[in-house]
Amino acid sequence: MSKLVAPHGGKGLVCCLLEGKALEDEKKKAAGLKQIEISSRAKGDLIMMGIGGFSPLNGFMNKADWKSVCEKMTLTDGTFWPVPVTLDVSAAEAKSIKAGEEVALVRKGEVMATMKVEEIYEMTEADKKMECELVFKGEGPDSEKFWEVAPEDHPGVKMVLAQKEYNIAGPVKVLSQGEFPEKFPGVYMTPAQLRAKMDERGWQKVAALQLRNPMHRSHEYLAKIGVEVCDGVVIHSLVGSLKPGDIPAEVRVKCIDTLVDKYFVKDFVIQAGYPLDMRYAGPREALLHATFRQNYGINNLLVGRDHAGVGDFYGMFEAQEIFRKMPTPADSGKRLLCEPLNIDWTFYCKKCDGMASMRTCPHGKEDRVILSGTKLRKMLSEGADVPDHFGRDEVLAILREYYSGLTEKVEVKMQRAASGSTM
């Protein structure tokens, strides 16, 4: 019998992905349905509903659930849920759909799911603004200052404001996991697959390290703290879409493979990937990270400095603080059971000659080097020398190769532009 934490919501893994004859029959039916083109984010959400990663959700939220999640961080039935999971459509599409109708949800020519539309509701500019304030603003600037910069500088806010005029809600039948199983074999895992792997190892107390950047020395330090205090650590990478300028998942996965192979005891670490896009929701997104990690069988989330941060919008430890403020339903099945493992500031200390934290290092600021993915990307993109304490040599070599390839592509484009060639 598994010793792992139960899935969120008290209903086991709620998986909307069809298989076998049911899948073939639904695909045939989908061919005759009205098609709705969906975003990359919605595609990731659908796959998570398909594989049970978003348990207990079985479809996109209606307006009552959307409002309750924004205001209270719970669904209307009292189950904890930190961010809206909605599907937007244009006014013309909304007008063409009737409640009770089934539609096919399509992403770039691939039918991802069918959906029974139970509700169609308008999202006014005031509704979108409310979602941004409650979900994305955090505890930082006041509303006036937030709105001075967020529409241009906050990627999560920009996405919400750019959404179409209506949302549609209802249960889904998922027909595909997209490109992820083939693109990331052995890394992309469903909750059931990861749970089986951890059960084989007899794990019970498991920590996850959330990653959207290449794994630098601070990440390695956090992961090894998790190894020390838990049965094992899952290095869990986002393999969906990020913002322009971020490093592709294929490169990040290769970096982690190399790091795990050379610097970890393999019995105590698993590399895995999940199919979501970043929402850039700051502290609320940290809660989402914990929520779906519970579905993967993980009961601790490593939360360090500026977890899921966006620029300067959030306090350095606001993502840790929100776990103390979230609602705790009386029913344990509806409560979030994945707890944070809070880690203080981490850095490379020149005097300690190694990674340290505010709790372990007595030295001053002049001896401390804060490591971040943003700094690392900047140095690599500019071709600057990267100090050894930022990353392992083997990882930096992979990243340099990637950025070298980008430089070559830019130079080729410039040469073609100068010569007038479009080939």
Curated annotation (Swiss-Prot):
Alphabetized Gene3D superfamilies for the sequence: HUPs (3.40.50.620), Sulfate adenylyltransferase (3.10.400.10)
Gene Ontology process terms (BP): hydrogen sulfide biosynthetic process; sulfate assimilation
Documented EC number(s): 2.7.7.4
Domain of life: Bacteria
Catalytic activity, reaction form: sulfate + ATP + H(+) = adenosine 5'-phosphosulfate + diphosphate
InterPro entries: ATP-Sase_PUA-like_dom (IPR025980), PUA-like_sf (IPR015947), Rossmann-like_a/b/a_fold (IPR014729), SO4_adenylyltransferase_pro (IPR020792), Sulfurylase_cat_dom (IPR024951), Sulphate_adenylyltransferase (IPR002650)
UniProt keyword terms in alphabetical order: ATP-binding, Nucleotide-binding, Nucleotidyltransferase, Transferase
UniProt pathway: Sulfur metabolism; hydrogen sulfide biosynthesis; sulfite from sulfate: step 1/3
Top EC class, one word: transferase
GO molecular function: ATP binding; sulfate adenylyltransferase (ATP) activity
Entry's family note: Belongs to the sulfate adenylyltransferase family.
Protein name: Sulfate adenylyltransferase
